[in-house]
C-alpha cells in the first residue's frame, strides 16, 4: 500500500526547508483509511500528509504533517489504520547553532507492524558511544542509529544527528540499506535553520552549547506506549477556565473536563421519552442500563447477590463488606471517614452549614445539604408514593425506592446488615446501629448506601397513590435528617389503612381499622433502642389542642424525663412550633386533617415515635403486620 512518495515536480508540493541547503519539494499521498479521533468522534482527516521513514529492521515509520504549516496540532490524538492511537505534543528543541528542530517532542508515529513510536530529543552526552551506529547522508550530515540502554530491551532508539560532519564512516553494513538512508535524508531535511536571529520555528531561542539531534523510540509489542506512559504520568494539560486550573494527562481528558464548565453534553439518550444527555459516552452507557435493567457488575462476596450498573457502584458496595473508608473529612478535629466522596461532600456541609437545595413550595423555606434529602422532602408536599411492593398480598407503597428496597427483607430470611466487630447480621440497619452502640460502644453513624444502589428498575414508579399525610419534621442544627411520615392512605375499593413509618425509615407497616380498634386507646412510645415507654392516657391531652408536658413512665412504672406532646389539631401548629422552638430538638406536627396522632420530642434529643388513640404502638403494629404476612412474630434482633 502506497502511503507516501517523493516527487520533485511542482504539483501538490510541500516544502521542508533545511539549514544551508535548498528546500525539498515533497508530494505526500494519504490513504482514506487514516482518520482523526477527536475525543470519541471520528472525523475524516483533511489536509494531512504522511512521510515514510524506513528503519534498519525493515519496518516503516510514517511521520504525519499538516499541509498548511507542516506541523501537527498540539494535543491532537490521531487514530491510525490498525485502530491504535497516536498522540502529539509540542516542545522546543535546543541545538548548537542557536536554533531548534521543527519536530515535536513526544510526536507519535505509527509503524508498519502496528507499534507506536514517539520522537524524543536527547543530548549527545547521554548516549553510550559504543551503542551508536553512524551513517553518512548525501548532504554531508551524519545520522546515528542509537540503541539506548535506558529503555527496555524491547525498545529501539533511532537517533539522528542532523549537523554532524564526521567523515569516513562505514555504511556498508547489511543492516543499513539504501532505502533507510534515503528516508533518513528526508527526515533530516525537516531541520529548519534561521542563522540570522537564532529563533526556532516555534519561537523559542535555542541553546548554543547543545547539539541539535532527535531520536525515535520504537516501542515493542511487549510494552505498548500510551499517552500516559509517554509522559511518565505527568499531567501536562491544564484547564484554562478561571478558578479551575486542574491538570490532566491527555488532551482528551481535558476536553471532557471542560464540558463541566461549558455544560456541553453531546451524548443524548435515544430511549423513547427520556432525552437525558451526558458529557461522556460512558455516562450515557451507564444511564441506558436504567432503561434495560442490565446490571453486569456482580458482587463476588459470599452470600451477597447484589449487582450494579457500573463498576464504580460495585466498588462502593464492596467497601460495605471490607469496611474501607478511604475518603476522610479534611476539617481539623473531625477525623471521620466515608465510603464515597459524595457522602464526604455532604458531610462537609455539616461543618460549613451549606444547604444548596431549597424547597420551592410556598411557605416552606426549608433547605437541605443533600439532593436525596431534598427529593424525599418534596414528596411530603406532593404526597407521592410511587414505589409499590410487588410481593402478592403486600401492596405497600413508599416515597423512595431505597425504602422499598430495604422493605423487601421482611419477605425473605435475608439479613444483609452485618456488624464489622463481631459479624452478627440483622435485617434492619437501625437494629445493627443499636447493637453496635450497646455491645461495642460504637456510636459511629452508619452511612446508607447511596441512591445509585437503589435506583428503580425501568417503568416502576409511574402509578402514584396520593392520600392525606401526617408528618413530623425534625429540625436539627448542622445535620439533615429525612422527615418521618405517618401517612393515612385511602384507596378506592379498599378499607382505610394507616402506614406506620419508623424514624429511620426502615419499618413500614399497614394496619387496618379493625386492627387499630382492637388495640385500644393506649399511648405507647418506642425509643430508638427499642425500649417501650407507656404514658398515662388523659382525655384532655388527647382531645385538646396545643402543647402539653407529661412525664414518661417506663414499663416498670418508674417516672422518667419530661416530654412535650404536640396535639393533632392543625390550628395548634403555629403555637406548638413556637413553644417548642427553644428545645434542642423539636418536632412539629403538619397534618391535612385531624387524626388521633401525637408526636413528641425529649429535651436530650432522643428520637421517639408516639402513636395515640386508635392507633397501636409501633411495636405492636409491626407484630400484627408480620403475623398477617408471614405467620410469625419477629423479635428485636430481626
From Swiss-Prot:
Predominant subcellular localization, coarse grouping: nucleus
Gene3D superfamilies membership: Classic Zinc Finger
Record's keyword terms, sorted: Acetylation, Activator, DNA-binding, Isopeptide bond, Metal-binding, Nucleus, Phosphoprotein, Repeat, Transcription, Transcription regulation, Ubl conjugation, Zinc, Zinc-finger
InterPro entries assigned: Znf_C2H2_sf, Znf_C2H2_type
GO CC terms, sorted: nucleus
Stored PROSITE patterns: ZINC_FINGER_C2H2_1, ZINC_FINGER_C2H2_2
Location of this chain's protein in the cell: Nucleus
Signal peptide: none
Subunit composition and interactions: Interacts with CHD8. Forms a complex with HCFC1 and ZNF143.
Purpose of the protein: Transcriptional activator. Activates the gene for selenocysteine tRNA (tRNAsec). Binds to the SPH motif of small nuclear RNA (snRNA) gene promoters. Participates in efficient U6 RNA polymerase III transcription via its interaction with CHD8. In complex with HCFC1 and ZNF143, regulates the expression of several genes, including AP2S1, ESCO2, OPHN1, RBL1, UBXN8 and ZNF32.
Family indicated by similarity: Belongs to the GLI C2H2-type zinc-finger protein family.
Name assigned to this protein: Zinc finger protein 143
